[in-house]
Every structure is written in C-alpha cells, then in structure tokens.
UniProtKB/Swiss-Prot annotation:
FAD binds at residues 3-17. The gene is dadA1. GO terms for biological process: D-alanine catabolic process. GO terms for cellular component: cytoplasm; plasma membrane. Pathway: Amino-acid degradation; D-alanine degradation; NH(3) and pyruvate from D-alanine: step 1/1. This is D-amino acid dehydrogenase 1. It comes from the Bacteria. Keywords: FAD, Flavoprotein, Oxidoreductase. It catalyses: a D-alpha-amino acid + A + H2O = a 2-oxocarboxylate + AH2 + NH4(+). HAMAP family: DadA. It comes from Mesorhizobium japonicum (strain LMG 29417 / CECT 9101 / MAFF 303099). GO terms for molecular function: D-amino-acid dehydrogenase activity.
Amino acid sequence: MQIMVLGGGVIGVTTAYYLAEAGHEVTVLDRQKGPALETSFANAGEISPGYASPWAGPGIPLKAIKWLLMKHGPLVVRPAFDPHMWTWLVKMLRNCTTERYAINKSRMVPLAEYSRDTLKALREATGITYDERTQGTLQLFRTQKQLDGTGGDVEVLKKYGVSYEILDQDGCIAAEPALGGVREKFVGGLRLPHDETGDCKMFTEKLAELCVARGVKFEYDTTIWRVLRSRNRVANLSTSKGFKASEAYVMALGSYSAGFMRRMKRSIPVYPVKGYSITVPIKDADVAPVSTVMDETYKVAITRLGDRIRVGGTAEISGFDLRLHESRRRTLEHSVGDLFPGAGAMREATFWCGLRPMTPDGPPLIGRTELSNLFLNTGHGTLGWTMACGSAKVLADIMSNKVPEIDARALAQERYLK
C-alpha cells in the first residue's frame, strides 16, 4: 500500500521505518530541511518507561498552584484567548482523579515498556547508535517528604513488574558518583535500572538513513497547507510543492495535528505544552552525571549524552509560542549547577524549546480515525522518545491488518468519542 507519513520527527520516521519493514511504499513529508528539527531536536534524552505517567493525577490542581508561585517552578501558564487551551485544561482537570489516573497509567506503561523492548530489538538488528546508555534513571529527592511520598508510585511499579530500587544517600552516590560532592542536597532516590538514555535527534537522523535504504522517500521543505477530504476519506494534500496523493495517510504532526484535523471537521484533544532544554558541553567528566538524574523538586531531567549534558524541563502552557524565556533557562542552569557543580561549560550551553503534543488524559492517539484512510500517531507529550518505536510498530501492524503485540485498543481516538 502507498502510505504518506505527515511529519519527520521521531514519531514520523519510526512510523515510516516499521511501515517499510512491513512491505509498504512510504513517503514522508516535512516542512523542515531534514528530520527531527522541531520537537525531536533537543529533548531531555530519556527513554523512561517507569516514568510513563499522566500529568493529570490526584492532587495535581493544588500542586499546580504551588508550582506557579515558585521562583524555579516547573509549571508556567501564560493565559491566552484561545478556546482550545481552556477546553484542553478543563478536560485535563477532569482526569485528575485516582480512578482516571489508574486507567490512564495502565494504558501508558505497557506501551512504554513495549517501546523500549522494540527499540532494543531495532538496535540489535541494525547496529544503530545514538549516544545511547542503558544505565537507568535516578529520581532524586531533596526532601524527606518527597521520599516518603513515593509509596503510590512504587505500588504502580510493582503492579506492572517494573524493576526499581529505593536508595538512601549512599545508594544514590553509588549510582551517580558525582553526587558525592553534594550529598547534603538530597536525602534519597528512586532508581529505575532498566531505563535508557540517548540522543533523539541523532537516532532519528540515522533511522531516516535506514529508511532510505529500505525505499522510503523523504520530501523535505514541503509545507502541508491543507488535508482535503472526499466524503469519508482523505483525497489529497495541498502543499507548497503542489498536490500530493496516496492510498493512506498517517498524521504524525505533533502539536499541529489537531489544527489539521479541525480543518477536516474532526477534533482530537491534542494541545502543545512547551518544554525547554539546555545542552552543555562537559568540561569535567568526573563530576558529570553517568545517566539521567531527575530533580524531583524542579521536575528537571539531567542526562548524559556522550560529551554533553542535556538538561530539560518545564511545562509551559502558552499555545504555539516558541519564544525562549530566560527565566526558564535560569531554572535549568540552577538545577544542574546545584547537583553537578563544575561539570559543564555553562557559558557554551545552547538553549532550546519545543512543543510537546499533549492529550488531557496522558496516553497518545494511535490508530484509525473516522476517515477510512487516515491514521493517527500523535499526542505522546513528554514521552515521544520513550514511546516512539512501540507506537510506530503498533500502527504498522494495524495498517497491515495484523493484531498488534500489545493491546492498543484504548489508545485509539474512540476513547474520546464515547
């Protein structure tokens, strides 16, 4: 089958790869000059199935108020006259219950675990490298209250068979030796030994090369203006390089997917939540992180990527605003400088932001739509890198009329149509 994948980020390129592996004729369209130049460009670098959790959870509304008042708080809301923002926020608040959290978590963890295993199989089959490390993730608690509050998370990890370790100060230092110089800054941690890290952009670029070797065509510098319908199917695309037609289409446009769906009189609850990162060259490897450290207080991820440190965090709800705010940079610099002083050449750091495509309940949207030849692979939020390979394999199976290896029925658009 001829399939056109809309979007050349990590979700679009992994989708193209697994569709090509399944024998389809695939073309990828993207407005940029190459793959992974938007949201996949400089994310935090984590592949963390154990942290696959909805943002909407019990207690979040009260925590959000506290975060908004913090100097280096992890949440920023810049109100705008945007009905889609407010509709999305209301839907998210409705999911902030214990019952909904459990349901949504149960849909996310199996996909994230499957995706990590699928990535491992891909790595073994192709030899692809991307500054990857398989040394786990350490969630670092600065206060005893944070450490004592891990009970609920641990129960969920137990339920899904996710390996974990509760660590005291010495245990944290054993996992991340550089923390030995700042042991007064934290009381303990929660380590997920099977989590991984890696450079998402590097991975996507190399996978795109593997796609080309499998016959996938990439049409860059191609802006999609409209997706044109004919009754209950997509007829063709209006683009900056003329009309494009295919037998089937995959919407993998991240935060921009919702706008294209609205123009077809269809709605999906995907809204952008901006995240920031800095990439810091390592100047002293002895005091740099080994893998990923999650600073629980500031919700910042500090990740070793080769000879660089990637520091990512912040949830900024401000629509499609891509302006870089220096206050967010200071938060990231504060976290990494506090826990790993002297590790990086901070003056040489690069500052970046991207728009995470979030659903109000947490799980992504994968599968069929009301239009017979249009499929979705979007809405992964902060977990696009974690879930990319698994999501792509699931969708490739669906489009090839195969039963996916995991139950993906609850990831379909139908959950919002009930």
